Amino acid sequence: MSWQEKINAALDARRTADALRRRYPVAQGAGRWLVADDRQYLNFSSNDYLGLSHHPQIIRAWQQGAEKFGVGSGGSGHVSGYSVVHQALEEELAEWLGYSRALLFISGFAANQAVIAAMMAKEDRIVADRLSHASLLEAASLSPSQLRRFTHNDVAHLARLLASPCPGQQLVVTEGVFSMDGDSAPLAEIQQVTQQHNGWLMVDDAHGTGVIGEQGRGSCWLQKVKPELLVVTFGKGFGVSGAAVLCSSTVADYLLQFARHLIYSTSMPPAQAQALRASLAVIRRDEGDARREKLVSLIARFRAGVQDLPFTLADSCSAIQPLIVGDNSRALQLAEKLRQQGCWVTAIRPPTVPAGTARLRLTLTAAHEMQDIDRLLEVLHGNG
């Protein structure tokens, strides 16, 4: 089989399964409204949970940062790309979340890959929730360590896997809020079992940070858990992009020596770090509380209105509200129907989610209004 035949076969298989991904160029895609092909849609696909991507203070901070520092960092943080603004953001994140240190990364994907690649050796074992994000599971699969997966949120299964002999160290990996189901991990129970077996815990809280807990401190703070490794990302609650790893001073020093994704990547622009500092300030103050409270009200309104629909509604109290329809083609048809009625919704299909669980991944944000939720419910009930 030639290269071209191999590529064609893979694409044909995706097409046949109604699983071929495609991108839609949008003129605006992160706020309450999505604009594509000169048409405006209510946007139920954005991860901008607090509606901060268009916040005037955050925009102004980025503009001022660009004027002062330029539009790029100029290099890796190990060379010339680590600015006083990066340092200030790391210190503010560490203080906010109760850690000694924070290290910035270009993306959550890079942060997860970097930590696992740097920390794990052949004699070690990773025990991961089987619904963990692709960045975590891919890094675990590519690492020299053994990978074992426990049934989603099943602490008893996790305990059994941890109890089996391991010559090295054990790292338990999970998410705070799961990206495709919107449910939360029982972090306190997971940490207890992990500590009983002398393991370390790594939590990716991409979808909880900024959105839940006191001052938006996220899933771990809410459940009174402090994992050895906490990954937070800035493309969701913060409304920007990038990520950070929160850890001890010793682990931070170790990652600065051995995390290749950090060492060999150009660091985020200082202007972006400036915008993230402004976003963090909004998240921590009363305005952040008001946005989180509004989001909770919107979620409650939506869940109350979909109980009688012929779909499986995931057990989620988060901004992620999946309607599981099962069949790929049906999910695509429903997403298209919603778009025709002015609601932009994304159909998520395998391999992103398990086979037979294709879904509409609906996301609600503080930028929405109650009438937006009512309109979505109207269309879902076939009255659009």
Swiss-Prot record:
InterPro entries: Aminotrans_II_pyridoxalP_BS (IPR001917), Aminotransferase_I/II_large (IPR004839), AON_synthase_class-II (IPR050087), AONS_Archaea/Proteobacteria (IPR004723), AONS_Proteobacteria (IPR022834), PyrdxlP-dep_Trfase (IPR015424), PyrdxlP-dep_Trfase_major (IPR015421), PyrdxlP-dep_Trfase_small (IPR015422). Keywords: Biotin biosynthesis, Pyridoxal phosphate, Transferase. The modification N6-(pyridoxal phosphate)lysine is found at K236. Pathway: Cofactor biosynthesis; biotin biosynthesis. The keyword NAD does not apply. Pyridoxal 5'-phosphate binds at G108, F109, S179, H207, T233. SUPFAM superfamilies: PLP-dependent transferases. One of its GO terms (molecular function) is pyridoxal phosphate binding. Substrate binds at R21, H133, T352. Its EC number is 2.3.1.47. CDD domains: KBL_like. The keyword Transferase applies. Its cofactor is pyridoxal 5'-phosphate. PANTHER family: 8-AMINO-7-OXONONANOATE SYNTHASE, CLASS II AMINOTRANSFERASE/8-AMINO-7-OXONONANOATE SYNTHASE. Catalyzes the decarboxylative condensation of pimeloyl-[acyl-carrier protein] and L-alanine to produce 8-amino-7-oxononanoate (AON), [acyl-carrier protein], and carbon dioxide. Belongs to the class-II pyridoxal-phosphate-dependent aminotransferase family. BioF subfamily. HAMAP family: BioF_aminotrans_2. This is 8-amino-7-oxononanoate synthase. The gene is bioF.
